[in-house]
Amino acid sequence: MYILGINCAYHESSVALVKVIGNNWKLISFVEEERFNRKKRAKPALIDNCDVLPHQSLEWTLERAGINMEDIAHVATSMNPEKRQKQNTEHDHGYEIEANGFGTIEGEEKFYKSTKNIEKKFRGLGFIGQFHFLNHHDCHSASSYYVSGFTDAVS
């Protein structure tokens, strides 16, 4: 089974591919889009470009593994749009924020829609497996634990 991780909600767009056989998780590849487009951080972090996929990283990863989108069982992105929208709109920030930007109701709605569009874009590329929106910081832990070979760890 193949699991593809994608980070594209902000900057530093990247793709990671893991192959899972039983309890053995093997990292096949990890690559950041900036290695292909030669732009530091790959893209600007804007309120409405969360769904700009790292296409060159994705193509390179699939080619390197010798697989197609149909071979991937799960795609996970390191952004949970529901959690983020709730966290960023239900309290006073205590500082001035730009109108229609990050942290405003209007801006967070744009961010939410753009983030939710990531799955649609993957479906358009032929992905037929399960899509997951995960909590960002949990992804940091998972990315090191599951491929570590350890059966027990503190994160």
Where are these regions (language model features)?
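Short acidic/glycine-rich loops and adjacent helix/strand connectors
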Residues: 1-155
